[in-house]
Amino acid sequence: MALLDDVKSELAAIDNELPIAKKAQATAMIRFGNGLHSVDHHILVQAQLDSQDAAIWLQDTIRNLYGHEATLTPVSRQTPTGVVQRFIVRVPKGSAALVLQTGLYSRYTKNMVLGLPGDIINGKIAQIKAAWRGAFLAGGHLSDPGKASYLEIVCPNHEAALALVSTARRLGITAKPRKLRSSERVTLRDPDAIERMLILMGAPHSAREWTGKRSDGEARGKANRLANFDDANMRRSAKAAAEACDKVRQAFEILGDDVPDNLKSAGQLRLDHADASLEQLGRLADPPITKDAIAGRIRRLLQLAEKTEKARRQAA
């Protein structure tokens, strides 16, 4: 646990990021810290973290960046392996405004975003790195030296896991989702990918310490070759995903509020899960639909926007 604590302390000490990156980190910490609750039909933001440094960072950011007061409460509980301490960051007033500010509540669908907001998933690389940093601060685990290598983040739901997988891909890293009992997790097992992710998140000192202590004996060059081999495919996939999201975003701008609910939901799913397949998008729909149905709805959304824009030009 000592090395994991060091990693989280190093990440929480970063203070030179742009506001968009700080917002992405705070949003991820709330989402992956199981921070969204419904109390008497009202939203309450209450995130649980295992790092005091991370909790202090989140409390300060909610106050200084979003303008809401947050409380920080340490709690302890006895387990078979000893006393476990957690830190609760709670927003007693202004939680509803905060989820709107973070993008965890969609203005388009009028529902909570189950993964990460599309503005982060499709955002700048600084936002992607910050989102992974926030997710790791909230739910991250790292293998101890001398044991099988892994970096893992416990996710609140499947959609959040998909968001991490797709954003890791934008960083050129392959992360795998898996289900352990009732828990959704995203895991990196390649030592070089773990070292690279630690550096990208902003923990170069911890990355060097972890790399120096690991004893798995795996050749580092193999991972580098695999990463280079995958780069071209990753770039092509990222370009196609970005183009698809741009078209949907443009359609929303053209149509404004005049969008049928089923088409709006399909478009928002594409924005929220840019790298998901049509089949995955269909499963994420509420209720679930086929990949052909989700593709048809997105196609009709784009056609409706094109028709509307054409009519406006003719009227002018």
Curated annotation (Swiss-Prot):
Pfam families: HTH_WhiA, LAGLIDADG_WhiA, WhiA_N
Gene3D superfamilies registered for this protein in UniProt: Homing endonucleases (3.10.28.10)
Transmembrane parts of this sequence: none
Record key words, sorted: Cell cycle, Cell division, DNA-binding
Ranges annotated as DNA-binding: 277-310
GO BP term (any one): regulation of sporulation
An MF annotation (GO) of this entry: DNA binding
HAMAP family: HTH_type_WhiA
Family label: Belongs to the WhiA family.
Protein purpose: Involved in cell division and chromosome segregation.
Full protein name: Probable cell division protein WhiA
